[in-house]
């Protein structure tokens, strides 16, 4: 928070602000723009005209609440009404009605949508901005070839190329190219107009031969030639109006529509003054582009950097929703046209309401949110995850790049990203560099560019002025960096400071500085700005830390970090997990479900979240932090949320850690923990699983929900009520029935075996007319039933069966196989849980909670964890919390080391713990082995870092298979836990078994347990009857499959006997 020159306060912008501003822009401008494009519709005889009056559209407040939409699997939407008129030209009568066009999904206050009960987010897309770009490439002979690429608003491309002989070509596709003169002639210019409006007419005339003159002799000839290259597959086309119209639709409208942004970029690059409302490519654009291309050939002009952010644009949620709304209106226009003509044909009297159907807009948006790659299910693991997901920017998607074809240069960090896109936070894997995260202070400008704020430094200004500069504009200023990033405005700057100018870093005098950054975290995303001492970490480890903080599970008893960065409060406030007072008043009632506040003669009901399931099965809740009768102010926190403490983000716990090896149990990033973390619920978390079953209407009748399930043991249905649904509050174990359901079926008597029919006749058991299809608790799941919902979707389109959902709350303690991590990319798997008495203990008798491997620090170069570890120990002894801004070396050298050692020294003096700081080995201490009581040979680094429990838990991953399905082709077990698949024995696993000489185990894994069909059947029979398992006598199915594939390549694999004799080689000693 900084004070500006006018006495006001400059705060960090809302982290959801970009999403909210985009949706508001769509509601205020996008709807009007698309509705104004709706054409007047007439019948065939042009007697009746239909039109929309776009000035009077209105959106109705949603009829349901957000929480009800989630539980009932509905869409949180608003109904759109527009005035429409039907004019009869003969009598000049107009019938005007307000019609319902459809439902529009509405964004909530967190920047998300609720579609069919699921929280979804529309992320921003970064694309190449429409316009013209010049670049140079080397051909096979090492000669530079200059090209100019015109990119349309929809991603279509038209390339202009100049070869070694200075001939200019227009490349329509990758293979076909035509002369630039043919293109200009097809656009309506004759040769004289072309030569009069270019700067180099002699170059264009130099390659004009008789054959070329014939092609451009008339517009018709040019269009025919252009059509041959562009669309004609075979034959000799003749000029016609349909051919001209087809070329106009296919090429000039699809590939040459620049749009508003493209027209602006074209005017700026080619120094044109064409009006911005003229959004199509004009002959004048081609002429100027050709002149510039020829100038580049002779050393004049500059090339473009395609990866510079000034050549990129952001396609926000407003653009995506507006495109879908325009698509829905086009479909509506066609539907109204067909309905109107049908009504006139059948001599019915149409009305505006009868002509318009509301399903088109609704289904268009349902398809967009369900299928579009930029519409994603909200990652709700913790509050931070929701914010980071909304601030992602992706180069993938329609019109963008793909993970397999994007080059390294596109993925790399560009200097123009400075202050706009975080250089650290990106995806790992194939999408690295293609999915980034926006910096904290960035905003989206009117032209789709990313703007970053700077302070203007001038002697004329008495105060501080903030400028938001788009990419490219800040390159013309000297931007101070490094030690000029002081938080205090009044600090005296040095005489010489590092600065950035034209993508280069310089050292200049302070008097030459034009701009300065406004905040130390200005260049990072919210995830990276939560890492203390980030300047001491390798960038790869900082990237891992940013991603792993999003995977942290909210704990039962959260704890705010001892060492932080100061951004924790902002992240918690903008995440929506806190309940904030909207006005001042007095609390008159509070419980776990709601808070009632009275003020200004009104009573406000603030509902609280209680055991709400996120999309990642984590438990979200809110706890009141105010008392009855307490007076509150506007903006005060009323209730804390999951993973928040005192209004700050709290994702983990500060535990006592030692960096030392321990009997090999922390080898290769494994982690050793104490049993007190389990018994004291230090890393215990709650998870909510949702189980769903549908009730269908079958051909034999409806399915029945009942508690009378035949052939099931009584203890499995003990928790069902009279309706056959599990009671809320019941404790369920694997195999218990949650919903009892019977499906009717027709079973013939002949379907049973003879002995079964005889037994039924003797005992008098009737043939069952239904089949048990109950919803049961799966293997490995247990917990408490916290909610049961019976959902019937009313209305809608198509068949909507009834659904019954059961929510089960699970309590998970930390166990062997769970994953934990710090905030510096240091992650590991729990390998062993030791008794408290066996853990190493300190000189004051406290046992260590967690043991990390010290070898994980030097090679990974994430030294920031050492600073956090030691400073956390000092903070726990002194009962202090630290908020450290990054790059504190701007104040003095070794600033981080000095503050850590000074705090440790103070802790050792004030708390009577001299072991906290020992001058011989500062930061380390002598600790004792809990098993023997002896001291370890070397001093060990101990401290209290902030440790997170990640969502990668062993309960979700452990899997076993006894029987299961096999693949049809290879006859091998399927892959994956969801399919009850088997464990793959690959090449390296076979080598390991061979190394130990376990021949029988290896044979079983490659034959009986895998794809030997006959041997599998023999093993089953032998197991039932008893006896020795026979050895397989023929080849397994995978070998037979290999033989068949070789035969498909005309290769026959055969075998033959060389000799029946045994050959022995006698080796003689040398």
From Swiss-Prot:
Keywords: DNA-directed RNA polymerase, Nucleotidyltransferase, Plastid, Transcription, Transferase. GO terms for molecular function: DNA binding; DNA-directed RNA polymerase activity; ribonucleoside binding. GO terms for cellular component: DNA-directed RNA polymerase complex; mitochondrion; plastid. Its EC number is 2.7.7.6. DNA-dependent RNA polymerase catalyzes the transcription of DNA into RNA using the four ribonucleoside triphosphates as substrates. In plastids the minimal PEP RNA polymerase catalytic core is composed of four subunits: alpha, beta, beta', and beta''. When a (nuclear-encoded) sigma factor is associated with the core the holoenzyme is formed, which can initiate transcription. This is DNA-directed RNA polymerase subunit beta. It comes from Cuscuta reflexa. The gene is rpoB.
């Amino acid at each position: 928070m900084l004070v500006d020159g006018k006495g006001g306060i400059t705060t960090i912008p809302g982290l959801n602000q970009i999403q909210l501003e985009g949706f508001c822009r769509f509601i205020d401008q996008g709807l009007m723009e698309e509705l104004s494009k709706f054409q007047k519709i007439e019948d065939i005889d042009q007697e009746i005209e239909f039109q929309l009056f776009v000035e009077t559209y209105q959106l109705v407040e949603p009829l349901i609440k957000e929480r009800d939409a989630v539980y009932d699997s509905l869409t949180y939407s608003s109904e759109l009404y527009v005035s429409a008129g039907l004019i009869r030209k003969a009598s000049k009568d107009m019938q005007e009605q307000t019609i319902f066009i459809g439902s529009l999904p509405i964004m909530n206050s967190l920047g998300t949508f609720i579609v069919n009960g699921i929280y979804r987010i529309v992320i921003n897309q970064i694309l190449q901005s429409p316009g013209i770009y010049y670049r140079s490439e080397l051909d096979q002979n090492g000669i530079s070839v200059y090209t100019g690429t015109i990119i349309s608003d929809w991603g279509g491309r038209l390339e202009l190329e100049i070869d070694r002989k200075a001939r200019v070509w227009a490349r329509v596709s990758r293979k076909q190219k035509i002369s630039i003169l043919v293109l200009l002639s097809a656009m309506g210019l004759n040769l004289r107009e072309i030569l009069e409006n270019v700067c180099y007419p002699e170059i264009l005339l130099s390659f004009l031969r008789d054959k070329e003159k014939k092609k451009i002799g008339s517009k018709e000839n040019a269009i025919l030639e252009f059509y041959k290259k562009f669309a004609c597959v075979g034959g000799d086309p003749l000029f016609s109006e349909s051919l001209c119209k087809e070329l106009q639709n296919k090429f000039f409208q699809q590939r040459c529509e620049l749009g508003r942004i493209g027209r602006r970029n074209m005017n700026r690059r080619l120094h044109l003054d064409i009006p911005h409302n003229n959004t199509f490519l004009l002959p004048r654009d081609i002429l100027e582009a050709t002149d510039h291309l020829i100038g580049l050939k002779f050393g004049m002009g500059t090339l473009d950097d395609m990866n510079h952010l000034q050549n990129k644009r952001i396609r926000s949620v407003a653009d995506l929703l507006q495109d879908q709304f325009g698509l829905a209106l086009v479909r509506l226009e066609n539907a109204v046209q067909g309905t109107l003509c049908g009504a006139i044909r059948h001599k019915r009297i149409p009305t505006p309401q009868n002509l318009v159907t509301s399903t088109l807009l609704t289904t268009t948006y349902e398809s967009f949110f369900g299928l579009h790659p930029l519409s994603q299910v909200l990652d709700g693991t913790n509050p931070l995850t929701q914010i980071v997901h909304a601030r992602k920017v992706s180069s993938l998607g329609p019109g963008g790049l793909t993970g397999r074809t994007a080059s390294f240069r596109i993925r790399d960090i560009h200097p123009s990203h400075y202050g706009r896109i975080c250089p650290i936070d990106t995806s790992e894997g194939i999408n690295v560099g293609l999915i980034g995260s926006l910096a904290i202070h960035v905003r989206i400008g009117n032209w789709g560019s990313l703007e970053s704020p700077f302070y203007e430094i001038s002697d004329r200004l008495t105060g501080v002025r903030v400028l938001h500069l788009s990419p490219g504009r800040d390159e013309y200023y000297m931007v101070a960096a490094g030690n000029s990033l002081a938080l205090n405005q009044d600090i005296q700057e040095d005489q010489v400071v590092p600065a950035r100018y034209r993508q280069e870093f310089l050292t200049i005098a302070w008097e030459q500085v034009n701009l300065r950054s406004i905040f130390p975290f200005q260049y990072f995303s919210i995830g990276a700005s939560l890492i203390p001492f980030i300047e001491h970490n390798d960038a790869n480890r900082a990237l891992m830390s940013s991603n792993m903080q999003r995977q942290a599970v909210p704990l039962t008893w959260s704890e705010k970090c001892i060492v932080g960065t100061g951004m924790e409060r902002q992240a918690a406030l903008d995440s929506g997990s806190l309940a904030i007072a909207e006005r001042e008043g007095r609390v008159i009632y509070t419980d776990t479900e709601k808070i009632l506040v009275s003020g200004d003669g009104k009573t406000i009901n603030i509902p609280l979240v209680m055991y709400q399931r996120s999309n990642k099965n984590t438990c979200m809740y809110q706890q009141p932090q105010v008392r009855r009768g307490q007076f509150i102010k506007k903006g005060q926190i009323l209730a804390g949320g999951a993973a928040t403490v005192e209004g700050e983000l709290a994702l983990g716990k500060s535990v006592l850690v030692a960096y030392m090896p321990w009997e090999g149990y922390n080898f290769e990033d494994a982690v050793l923990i104490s049993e007190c973390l389990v018994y004291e619920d230090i890393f215990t978390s709650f998870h909510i699983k949702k189980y769903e079953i549908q009730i269908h209407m079958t051909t034999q009748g409806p399915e029945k929900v009942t508690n009378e399930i035949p052939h099931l043991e009584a203890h499995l249905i003990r928790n069902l009520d009279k309706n056959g649904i599990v009671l809320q509050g019941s404790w369920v174990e694997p195999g218990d029935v949650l919903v009892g359901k019977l499906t009717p079926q027709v079973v013939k008597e002949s379907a049973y075996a003879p002995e079964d029919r005889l037994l039924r006749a003797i005992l008098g058991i009737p043939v069952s007319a239904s089949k048990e299809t109950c919803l049961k608790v799966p293997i490995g799941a247990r917990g408490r039933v916290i909610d049961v919902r019976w959902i019937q979707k009313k209305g809608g389109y198509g068949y909507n069966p009834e659904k019954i959902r059961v929510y089960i709350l699970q309590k998970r303690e930390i166990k062997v196989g769970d994953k934990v991590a710090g905030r510096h990319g240091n992650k590991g798997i729990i390998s062993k849980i030791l008794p408290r008495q066996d853990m190493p203990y300190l000189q004051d008798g406290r046992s260590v909670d967690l043991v990390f491997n010290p070898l994980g620090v030097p090679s990974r170069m994430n030294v920031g964890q050492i600073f956090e570890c030691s400073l956390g120990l000092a903070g726990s002894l002194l009962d202090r919390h630290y908020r450290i801004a990054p790059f504190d070396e701007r104040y003095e050298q070794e600033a981080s080391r000095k503050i850590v050692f000074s705090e440790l020294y103070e802790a050792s003096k004030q708390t009577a713990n001299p072991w906290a700081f020992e001058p011989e080995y500062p930061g380390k201490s002598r600790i004792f082995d809990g098993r023997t009581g002896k001291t370890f040979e070397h001093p060990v680094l101990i401290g209290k870092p902030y440790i997170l429990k990640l969502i990668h838990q062993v309960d979700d991953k452990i899997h076993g298979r006894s029987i299961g399905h096999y693949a049809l082709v290879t006859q091998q077990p399927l892959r994956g836990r969801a399919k009850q698949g088997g464990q793959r024995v690959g090449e390296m696993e076979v080598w390991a078994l061979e190394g130990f000489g376990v021949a029988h185990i290896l044979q079983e894994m490659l034959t009986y347990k895998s794809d030997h069909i006959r041997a599998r059947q023999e093993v089953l029979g032998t197991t039932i009857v008893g006896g020795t398992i026979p050895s397989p006598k023929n080849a397994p199915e995978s070998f037979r499959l290999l033989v068949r594939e070789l035969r498909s390549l005309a290769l026959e694999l055969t075998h033959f006997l060389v000799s029946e004799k045994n050959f022995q080689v006698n080796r003689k000693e040398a």
